[in-house]
Amino acid sequence: MNLDQKGLKKRSITVAYFFNTIGKKNDIKFRRLNEVDEQKRRIFERDLHRPGLALAGFTNLFTYKRVQILGNTETRFLNHLEEEERNRVFANLVRFKMPCIILTSNNKLPQNLLDMATNADIPVYVTRCSSTKTIYIVTGFLDDQFSLYQQYHGSMVDVYGVGVLLTGKSGLGKSEIALDLVERGHGLVADDVVVIHRKGESMVLNAKRNNIIDHFMEIRGLGVVDVRANFGIRAIRDVKEVQVVVELLEWNKEIVYERLGLDIKSRKILGVDVPLVELPIFPGKNITVIIEVVALNFLLKRYSNYVAAEALTDRINDVINREKGEEDSYE
């Protein structure tokens, strides 16, 4: 199954969406300072800009398509200018079609400058947060919005704190296995459609549910199951890092499957290598327990650098070497 698809990315978001959403997910509040149509302004980049050089008159390399941050330095520079010069400088700034302006640390602009921004259809906001905190939060929010993402067919489950992505052909029982794991106390992230994001150059992949399907599951022969209603809030997760891929395979007696676990495999998702476990399925095989052991093995390797197959191999080699040494001593 090819999971390494190119990935999609939002081209832009409206300033209205930015203003209405960021405060719900982050510890930051913005207040409007003017009334313009925020739907007409769009943000195209995750990077922000502090227009110090543009205020000083150098606009050759002005990245005006980014959200503009005016902190203590920029506002004090404007305020120390004579009114006529200040108006000229700010008029030169707002002639560019920027998404919006954010004032940090409760800084203020004279009303005539706000009127200039309004006439140019540029939204202006203010926050009590410092420039450092504002840039950190807004950059993180835009990172999420413009991150690479792709939708995959499968189920995503939190097993002992390990994010396990179940993949495989339709009809192999991915949803049934995920439901069994939920019944055993683990958490469902998504079923059928798993949305995976990669933020920036990070090597971390985060999986989320499809907002339409939410935490509903379709079980063949039973129908639709509402996991949250049936099992409670403890049975669901909003987001989880993809740490292990378990691919379910139809049993084929002609294929020699891995028996020791020394052959480490991986699957590339959005350019990131994720550990892969291939599980052949046949009637009577308890896949749920095996997936729990997969998660526990992942934790053992991550926190103790312990791999059972390597430990057994080392033990066998020690016995062989010891017996060989005893034979040499008899000679």
Swiss-Prot record:
Note: Both phosphorylation and phosphorolysis are carried out by the same active site and suggest a common mechanism for both reactions.
Chain sites annotated for binding Mg(2+): S175, E218
Family per similarity comment: Belongs to the HPrK/P family.
Superkingdom of the source species: Bacteria
GO BP of this protein: regulation of carbohydrate metabolic process
Residues annotated to bind ATP: G168, K169, S170, G171, L172, G173, K174, S175
Catalytic activity, as annotated: [HPr protein]-L-serine + ATP = [HPr protein]-O-phospho-L-serine + ADP + H(+); [HPr protein]-O-phospho-L-serine + phosphate + H(+) = [HPr protein]-L-serine + diphosphate
Enzyme class: transferase
Protein name: HPr kinase/phosphorylase
Active-site residues, record numbering mapped to chain: H153, K174, D192 (proton acceptor), R259
Gene3D superfamilies: HprK N-terminal domain-like, P-loop containing nucleotide triphosphate hydrolases
Pfam family, one: Hpr_kinase_N
Region (Important for the catalytic mechanism of both phosphorylation and dephosphorylation): 217-226
Cofactor: Mg(2+)
Keywords: ATP-binding, Kinase, Magnesium, Metal-binding, Multifunctional enzyme, Nucleotide-binding, Serine/threonine-protein kinase, Transferase
Record-linked HAMAP family: HPr_kinase
Protein purpose: Catalyzes the ATP- as well as the pyrophosphate-dependent phosphorylation of a specific serine residue in HPr, a phosphocarrier protein of the phosphoenolpyruvate-dependent sugar phosphotransferase system (PTS). HprK/P also catalyzes the pyrophosphate-producing, inorganic phosphate-dependent dephosphorylation (phosphorolysis) of seryl-phosphorylated HPr (P-Ser-HPr).
Subunit relationships: Homohexamer.
Species whose genome carries this gene: Pelodictyon phaeoclathratiforme (strain DSM 5477 / BU-1)
Gene for this chain: hprK
Domain writeup: The Walker A ATP-binding motif also binds Pi and PPi.
Important for the catalytic mechanism of dephosphorylation: annotated span: 280-285
EC identifiers of the protein: 2.7.11.-, 2.7.4.-
InterPro entries found in the cross-reference section: HPr(Ser)_kin/Pase, Hpr_kin/Pase_C, Hpr_kin/Pase_Hpr_N, P-loop_NTPase, Ser_kin/Pase_Hpr-like_N_sf
PANTHER family in alphabetical order: HPR KINASE_PHOSPHORYLASE, PROTEIN YJDM-RELATED
Molecular function GO terms recorded: ATP binding; magnesium ion binding; phosphorelay sensor kinase activity; protein serine/threonine kinase activity; protein serine/threonine/tyrosine kinase activity
